[in-house]
Structures are given as C-alpha cells and as structure tokens.
Amino acid sequence: AAAAPPRRGPSGPDA
C-alpha cells in the first residue's frame, strides 16, 4: 500500500 489514498476506509490502511 505504498500509494494508498490518505482517506481511511474499508480498503485503506486503517482496515
């Protein structure tokens, strides 16, 4: 997830 979006969602780094 090197280019993951800054928003937190079900597909984000906070999943």
From Swiss-Prot:
Additional detail: On the 2D-gel the determined pI of this unknown protein is: 6.8, its MW is: 71.0 kDa.
Protein name: Unknown protein from spot 1131 of 2D-PAGE of etiolated coleoptile
